[in-house]
Amino acid sequence: MTAPPPVLTRIDLRGAELTAAELRAALPRGGADVEAVLPTVRPIVAAVAERGAEAALDFGASFDGVRPHAIRVPDAALDAALAGLDCDVCEALQVMVERTRAVHSGQRRTDVTTTLGPGATVTERWVPVERVGLYVPGGNAVYPSSVVMNVVPAQAAGVDSLVVASPPQAQWDGMPHPTILAAARLLGVDEVWAVGGAQAVALLAYGGTDTDGAALTPVDMITGPGNIYVTAAKRLCRSRVGIDAEAGPTEIAILADHTADPVHVAADLISQAEHDELAASVLVTPSEDLADATDAELAGQLQTTVHRERVTAALTGRQSAIVLVDDVDAAVLVVNAYAAEHLEIQTADAPQVASRIRSAGAIFVGPWSPVSLGDYCAGSNHVLPTAGCARHSSGLSVQTFLRGIHVVEYTEAALKDVSGHVITLATAEDLPAHGEAVRRRFER
């Protein structure tokens, strides 16, 4: 009897000495081609910018077969959703909110004043974005956790005005899923829009008038994950509003050695593959025995996985693989080059190995810190950079919703003390009017 084919493709980097750039080229990476859908999304954004809610509702009816009575969800529907929420789900959401607030409440930066001399100060003042739109996707699953992960840091930053946008659902009379509504109400958000996709992003950016004549006020910033069309719309609208990031398909990398339990490793790889057929699951290990055992576990666990078809497509896609390396040192180089959204460390000395990681959206240390914990109740944020963007970007946090403003205050004497240098530099850059703006202050 022949052995079943391996679930995951293998990439053997043992004996290879590659630069970070060469590693990135050798490692599996899927992702979606946002550029390819821009021609489709651009007219949607333009139409919503011109016709507002009417266009957004038309697109929703055309794409999804759902046309809500209005964009804004009535307060009574939010109250009813929270009242009807399953008690266990409500309790779990409350725990998630408490733990997420505990972590994020300490993240807010304080104003800092630097004195450069008598009468010369520069203060960095942190000011929250005034109005933020938080997108919560529909699709393969319901994501009340995304409501929490977006709303909590925005509230901790002091954002005054929040609106949650989520796709209307035919089975809920054109409202977003009631669990989404309940999560918003639980967090004290009273403005929820029943609109999804690229048209939701455009409506958040440009605003409009609802079917009852009420204003749909545009936002200053849009955050939250979504599909490729949502991502494309965020790209097109980012000159008008700020965005958090262009989210791609989710990904997990696991750095594991011979001490790791293949049952845990396989379960964690499957857990992220459950999100999307484009999700990436990557194991980086120096242990061929662990690679074999994990592949066998994957084959076995897939038999009882609820979303087997979706998970199998993700695991067998070009974005997923087992990467064999010489040792843990080589594995660290690989995962730093890969810059995963989620990185688990399951090695003999996991905390020490984790301290060497410089590029990851979030790091989960040891066998009892699975990514699923971070998705819900670790207290960390699960809106994280994908597609290698962890090399230069961070996950959603309180800082996402804050703007640093430099406040410069000099006295006459302080300006006079540095005026000669200002005039010299302005002259060197052939900007004489800059120097004159200083010199004329001391003419009389």
Swiss-Prot record:
Pfam family, one: Histidinol_dh
Keywords for this protein: Amino-acid biosynthesis, Histidine biosynthesis, Metal-binding, NAD, Oxidoreductase, Zinc
Amino acids binding Zn(2+): 272, 275, 375, 434
List of residues binding NAD(+): 135, 199, 227
Record's keyword annotation contains Metal-binding: yes
Alphabetized PROSITE patterns for the sequence: HISOL_DEHYDROGENASE
Cofactor(s) listed: Zn(2+)
Active-site residues, Swiss-Prot/TrEMBL: 341-342
EC number(s) reported in the record: 1.1.1.23
Reactions catalysed according to its record: L-histidinol + 2 NAD(+) + H2O = L-histidine + 2 NADH + 3 H(+)
Gene Ontology process terms (BP): L-histidine biosynthetic process
Annotated InterPro entries: Ald_DH/histidinol_DH (IPR016161), Histidinol_DH_CS (IPR001692), Histidinol_DH_monofunct (IPR022695), Hstdl_DH (IPR012131)
Cofactor binding note: Binds 1 zinc ion per subunit.
Gene Ontology cellular-component terms listed: cytoplasm; cytosol; peptidoglycan-based cell wall
Binding positions for substrate per the UniProt entry: 250, 272, 275, 342, 375, 429, 434
GO MF annotations in UniProt: histidinol dehydrogenase activity; NAD binding; zinc ion binding
Pathway connected to this protein: Amino-acid biosynthesis; L-histidine biosynthesis; L-histidine from 5-phospho-alpha-D-ribose 1-diphosphate: step 9/9
Record-linked NCBIfam families: hisD
Function according to Swiss-Prot or TrEMBL: Catalyzes the sequential NAD-dependent oxidations of L-histidinol to L-histidinaldehyde and then to L-histidine.
Cited PANTHER family: HISTIDINE BIOSYNTHESIS TRIFUNCTIONAL PROTEIN, HISTIDINOL DEHYDROGENASE HDH
Subunit structure: Homodimer.
Descriptive protein name: Histidinol dehydrogenase
Species per Swiss-Prot/TrEMBL record: Mycobacterium tuberculosis (strain ATCC 25618 / H37Rv)
Lineage: Bacteria, Bacillati, Actinomycetota, Actinomycetes, Mycobacteriales
Gene name per UniProt: hisD
